[in-house]
From Swiss-Prot:
Family, as annotated: Belongs to the class-II aminoacyl-tRNA synthetase family.
EC number: 6.1.1.14
One Gene Ontology CC term in the entry: cytosol
Keywords carried by this UniProt record: Aminoacyl-tRNA synthetase, ATP-binding, Cytoplasm, Ligase, Nucleotide-binding, Protein biosynthesis
Source species: Salmonella paratyphi A (strain AKU_12601)
Protein name, as recorded: Glycine--tRNA ligase beta subunit
Subunit and partners: Tetramer of two alpha and two beta subunits.
Record-linked Pfam families: DALR_1 (PF05746), tRNA_synt_2f (PF02092)
Amino acid sequence: MSEKTFLVEIGTEELPPKALRSLAESFAANFTAELDNAGLAHGNVEWFAAPRRLALKVANLAESQPDREVEKRGPAIAQAFDAEGKPSKAAEGWARGCGITVDQAERLKTDKGEWLLYRAHVKGESTEALVPNMVVTSLAKLPIPKLMRWGASDVHFVRPVHTVTLLLGDKVIPATILGIQSDRVIRGHRFMGEPEFTIDSAEQYPQILLERGKVIADYEARKAKIKADAEEAARKIGGNADLSESLLEEVASLVEWPVVLTAKFEEKFLAVPAEALVYTMKGDQKYFPVYDNAGKLLPNFIFVANIESKDPTQIISGNEKVVRPRLADAEFFFNTDRKKRLEDHLPRLQTVLFQQQLGTLRDKTDRIQALAGWIAGQIGADVNHATRAGLLSKCDLMTNMVFEFTDTQGVMGMHYARHDGEAEDVAVALNEQYQPRFAGDDLPSNPVACALAIADKMDTLAGIFGIGQHPKGDKDPFALRRAALGVLRIIVEKNLNLDLQTLTEEAARLYGDKLTNANVVDDVIDFMLGRFRAWYQDEGYTVDTIQAVLARRPTRPADFDARMKAVSHFRTLEEASALAAANKRVSNILAKATEPLNDIVHASVLKEAAEIELARHLVVLRDKLQPYFADGRYQEALIELAALRAPVDEFFENVMVNAEEKDIRINRLTLLSKLRELFLQVADISLLQ
């Protein structure tokens, strides 16, 4: 069977830069699945993405599906014909479905009887016939939140489509996709190269687009070029470019022919906090800031043009003129804001609503102030500083700088607090209260900041759950999942002695009578334990390990983490599977027991050597392990409990639990309950698979 290279390119208006990669990757994944489902043999599926195109190139694509033999078994002969030998309705219906008559059917004889049988040799469909619908289906499944239509057409796509190139080898596959007739026409760069040209074969892509169209269609190659050229440009001016992955991806999605240039701004702007300057350079202008080797911002920036200019100084000058007013605004806001103390903004917080039922930002500030102080007392942080940080926590939201550059919230609070002479840990806490903002983000660096960050998040969790507006499906407008995971990460990774039960109770208490959900505390804790499940799964822990710990519902996150590590280690022990099975057996036996058990195991009632030996081990371990449990040394405890494998095996091998004599039976059930209680001090290992 012959194989050819296949190419599909969808030429569009400028695609959303932040979605470009996901669109291309989804297109490739969808189309690959279509090929596999159709049984079309193929080689590597390579995707290409640039601002005005999505493309796929498939190596070694078979020109048709393989032929296949089809067999369909029909009714048994006894049901296929009546007493007179005439075909039954069932037989005729089956034959019609196969496209034959009953007389044309073969017969299949087996040891179990005889059936009608249809056999056919089905010729595989051509790739040319199959591919158009595959492309249409793959495009329809792209993750596009909002479609648009253009002109008089009722076709919908993420952006207007101008060209559809569909080639199998050197042949155009005729099709109409997104309202456009397929062809071999490709559009080049808007201002460089050839604006439009034809491609002779799929093999020529993307090289022909590079040479004639001045477009680097390979997304990763374009991104790598920007990164390398920006690093070199920064090195030439004695600095290091801030090439954050997200901005690098966005810029790579904005240009077809990247040209890296260096520009500068007045040094006077460096008196403004670097974060504000960086925010406007990266967020508004898509520029890469440059730092010296000490990490200090330089009065330079790197940007990427989408054209090779005969006079690059004009482009550089233009970008400098664009950024200058933005930096001047930041300078003005900074100087204006410093004329007031942070504390002076407190009254204005009363004018901003946090949530309709939960009050204003000033109300939230008062709660955070109290809760941060309470948390500080629990974890050994400075209570006065935590309380002060809570009071000032939202004041920077009322400043000109944060109003204009919203992402500088927190960090500007820190700078203004330092200007006001606040304690350093208070100032730092104002910046770090929102950490961690995302998975893998840094945690607050000092105890006061930890107290404030936890207080802010717990206040939101208690409040929103308290009015019954918990997250549903993908909707989480108050980012409660992120808040819950942030609290857990801080407590676990900083090893803070906090209990979710008392923490949530205190957060809910501070709302007074505003909360309508009587189960708010349990609901918040259950939600946070659910976040634990997701976190540990991401960390590579098995589901049954997580379930074993969750069954005990530990509400101290640091304690939960210690149990997780202990059970995970226990699973590696040779005795683990046998003891897990034994615990499951014990759990089932106790669940079926209907008689009340004894408080203790009565040694005088023990008869068999195996039960006497098991009881002896339990007494020794119970006394030995109490300090382990009290100190959270769960891993050591489970290692000790692993020694019970032999006596437990002996017990089940030689002892009849449900003895006829009631006192013996109840004593043995009590013995098993004591065994189970020891393991349950750590986790329910009966849930381990």
